[in-house]
Amino acid sequence: MIDDDGYRPNVGIVICNRQGQVMWARRYGQHSWQFPQGGINPGESAEQAMYRELFEEVGLRKKDVRVLASTRNWLRYKLPKRLVRWDTKPVCIGQKQKWFLLQLMCNESDINMQSSGTPEFDGWRWVSYWYPVRQVVSFKRDVYRRVMKEFINPVILLQESVAARVATPSGPRRKRG
């Protein structure tokens, strides 16, 4: 499904842990890393596509994550001319993406890159929040920068809530006398 401007509707997924690190996934058989992403099927909402891609690419279900935010607008990137398939109709010149920020609520051991018949990724790791902006392939950098700027406040709030829980002593306080 390509829109009238030549862009394929797509969802992107940023998964974070309680420390504010983000999941960085290695493309299958390559040394190229990125966030999970995938196309939106006809008749599918962006949120439905996100949950489908979440399972297909990292083996997680709705119960395993919590949605913290989504981008207000569609973000676009153009493919380099060498990657455009000029012989297909309609020609896809890039992607327009709706991004979702998810908090991992399950154990890391529940992540399964082999959950679909044709895996997109063969490895992953936690990286610092801004690391992907510097490391992603150059034509996606502007979109990644915009996504991470838009999602920084929910991530900071998450980190602060975790820090507050750690700093708060558990159990009743005893009165010293």
Curated annotation (Swiss-Prot):
UniProt GO cellular component terms: cytoplasm
Broadest EC class assigned to this enzyme: hydrolase
Highest rank taxon of the organism: Bacteria
Keyword line: Hydrolase, Metal-binding
Family, per entry: Belongs to the Nudix hydrolase family. RppH subfamily.
Biological role stated in the UniProt entry: Accelerates the degradation of transcripts by removing pyrophosphate from the 5'-end of triphosphorylated RNA, leading to a more labile monophosphorylated state that can stimulate subsequent ribonuclease cleavage.
Listed name of the protein: RNA pyrophosphohydrolase
Species this protein is from: Pectobacterium carotovorum subsp. carotovorum (strain PC1)
Gene encoding the protein: rppH
